[in-house]
Amino acid sequence: MKTPITEAIASADSQGRFLSNGELQAVNGRYQRAAASLGAARSLTNNAQRLITGAAQSVYTKFPYVTQMPGPTYASSAIGKAKCARDIGYYLRMVTYCLVVGATGPMDEYLVAGLEEINRSFELSPSWYVEALQYIKGSHGLSGQIGNEANVYLDYAINTLS
């Protein structure tokens, strides 16, 4: 999994040299942001259920047909609603994983790679998850550097789905 730290080390090692001042500065920058990133991951994790429930409700409000259409890919039943919440939770978990490592690697490797195929196979609309992630971004209650760190990966997920 690529992170700013592993990329700096891999580059130096492939050239048989020590880390350059620029690479050391990049590593130091990651360490300086790490506390804010971990704070964001902790807060999103602690508030996950509230955020997921609110995000699902936001999807149902913006796309009411989701709760009216029968079938396994819609939220017209308790099972469908549980699947929707599960999927939103998956995106939120990926955001927290990215916050922990300080890079988009977890999302790229575990989510983005097969996203289009999954959505097509199960007839899932990316716009549902864009709405859910926008709700989470607007409702997480994080501010300052902690909020900025969370928003980097929420925006990345939103842009990937758009």
From Swiss-Prot:
CDD domains: PC-PEC_alpha. Heterodimer of an alpha and a beta subunit, which further assembles into trimers and the trimers into hexamers. The basic functional unit of phycobiliproteins is a ring-shaped hexamer formed from two back-to-back trimers contacting via the alpha chain subunits. The trimers are composed of alpha/beta subunit heterodimers arranged around a three-fold axis of symmetry. The phycoerythrins also contain a gamma subunit which is located in the center of the hexamer. Disulfide bonds: none annotated. (2R,3E)-phycocyanobilin binds at C84. This is C-phycocyanin alpha chain. Keywords: Antenna complex, Bile pigment, Chloroplast, Chromophore, Electron transport, Membrane, Photosynthesis, Phycobilisome, Plastid, Thylakoid, Transport. Light-harvesting photosynthetic bile pigment-protein from the phycobiliprotein complex (phycobilisome, PBS). Phycocyanin is the major phycobiliprotein in the PBS rod. It is found in: Plastid, Chloroplast thylakoid membrane. One of its GO terms (biological process) is photosynthesis. Its main location: plastid. One of its GO terms (cellular component) is phycobilisome. Belongs to the phycobiliprotein family. Pfam families: Phycobilisome. It is a peripheral membrane protein. InterPro entries: Globin-like_sf, Phycobilisome_asu/bsu, Phycobilisome_asu/bsu_sf, Phycocyanin_a. Contains one covalently linked phycocyanobilin chromophore. PANTHER family: C-PHYCOCYANIN ALPHA SUBUNIT (PTHR34011:SF4), PHYCOBILISOME 32.1 KDA LINKER POLYPEPTIDE, PHYCOCYANIN-ASSOCIATED, ROD 2-RELATED (PTHR34011).
